[in-house]
Amino acid sequence: MKLIYQGKTKNVYSLDNDNVMLKFKDDCTGKDGVFDPGENSVGLTIEGIGKANLISSIHYFELLKKAGIKTHYVSANVEDATMEVLPATTFGHGIEVICRLVATGSFIRRYGEYIKDGTPLEGGYVECTFKTML
């Protein structure tokens, strides 16, 4: 296994079978020790959040599979906080899919004129954005 990329919340490794291993970390985006899902830097560590994020990812990949939608997901190991995926060629720096259940972080910075911080987003709000390296 060879480290090929270190991200804010995951490290990416190449595997001998040409697949890719994602190692979910307990690091969170935020600022000055305060969690903020819209921040572009690591601001704190929360023990167990890597595994929680992996469990959430598995859930959504399984829903996609059940709906007959193909993905790059191969398998996961919750104890090790790892996910094996097929290699993929990304557009630019990749696409980010964000599911928000509460209005906070960058969502409030963009839409705070219309909604209060902490407001539950009934049914969730999903947005797709291009990743930037800013």
Where are these regions (language model features)?
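Active-site loop/lid in soluble adenylation, ligation, and acyl-transfer enzymes
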Residues: 1-133
